[in-house]
C-alpha cells in the first residue's frame, strides 16, 4: 500500500461511495487500516445501552471510517493529489494541481 497523505484536520471530498460529492473535515486517520473518519460522511446508526457515561442510551448517529482511496484532498473546493517537496530544508506537502504548499 502507498503512504497515507491525508492528515487530521484536512478538508477532503468523497470521490466514491454513497456519500460521493460530500466534503468534510478529517477527524482521524488510521494508517494501518488505510481508513479515515470524516465529519458528516458515512453516517451509521448505533444502538447504545444505558451506561454510566450515557444514562439515556438509545439510538446514536455517528461517523464510520471510510477508505482513504475513496477520498481526495480538497483545495478551494477542487480535488487535488498531494505530493512532497523540500522547502528551506523541510519536507512539506504540496498540492500537485497548483504547486501550492499545504502545510
From Swiss-Prot:
SUPFAM superfamilies, sorted: Translation proteins SH3-like domain
Q: Which Pfam families match?
A: KOW, ribosomal_L24
Q: What's the encoding gene here?
A: rplX
Specify the protein name.
Large ribosomal subunit protein uL24
Membership in a protein family:
Belongs to the universal ribosomal protein uL24 family.
The record, for PROSITE patterns, names:
RIBOSOMAL_L24
BP term (GO), one: translation
Q: Which CDD domains match?
A: KOW_RPL26 (cd06089)
Q: GO terms for CC?
A: ribonucleoprotein complex; ribosome
Q: Which SMART domains match?
A: KOW
Indicate whether Disulfide bond appears among the record's keywords: no
Its function?
One of two assembly initiator proteins, it binds directly to the 5'-end of the 23S rRNA, where it nucleates assembly of the 50S subunit.
The record's HAMAP family line, in alphabetical order, gives:
Ribosomal_uL24_B
Example of a GO MF term: structural constituent of ribosome
Subunit arrangement? Part of the 50S ribosomal subunit.
At the top level, the lineage of the source is: Bacteria
Against InterPro entries, the record matches this protein to: KOW, Rib_uL2_dom2, Ribosomal_uL24, Ribosomal_uL24_CS, Ribosomal_uL24_KOW, Translation_prot_SH3-like_sf
Give the source species. Answer: Lachnospira eligens (strain ATCC 27750 / DSM 3376 / VPI C15-48 / C15-B4)
Record's keyword terms, sorted: Ribonucleoprotein, Ribosomal protein, RNA-binding, rRNA-binding
Amino acid at each position: 500500500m502507498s503512504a497515507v497523505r491525508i492528515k487530521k484536520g484536512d478538508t477532503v471530498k468523497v470521490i466514491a461511495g454513497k456519500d460521493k460529492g460530500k466534503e468534510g473535515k478529517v477527524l482521524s486517520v488510521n494508517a494501518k487500516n488505510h481508513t479515515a473518519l470524516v465529519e458528516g460522511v458515512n453516517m451509521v446508526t448505533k444502538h447504545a445501552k444505558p451506561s454510566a457515561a450515557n444514562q439515556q442510551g438509545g439510538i446514536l448517529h455517528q461517523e464510520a471510517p471510510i477508505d482513504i482511496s475513496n477520498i481526495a484532498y480538497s483545495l478551494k473546493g477542487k480535488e487535488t493529489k498531494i505530493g512532497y517537496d523540500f522547502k528551506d530544508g523541510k519536507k512539506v506537502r504540496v498540492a500537485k494541481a497548483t504547486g501550492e504548499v499545504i502545510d
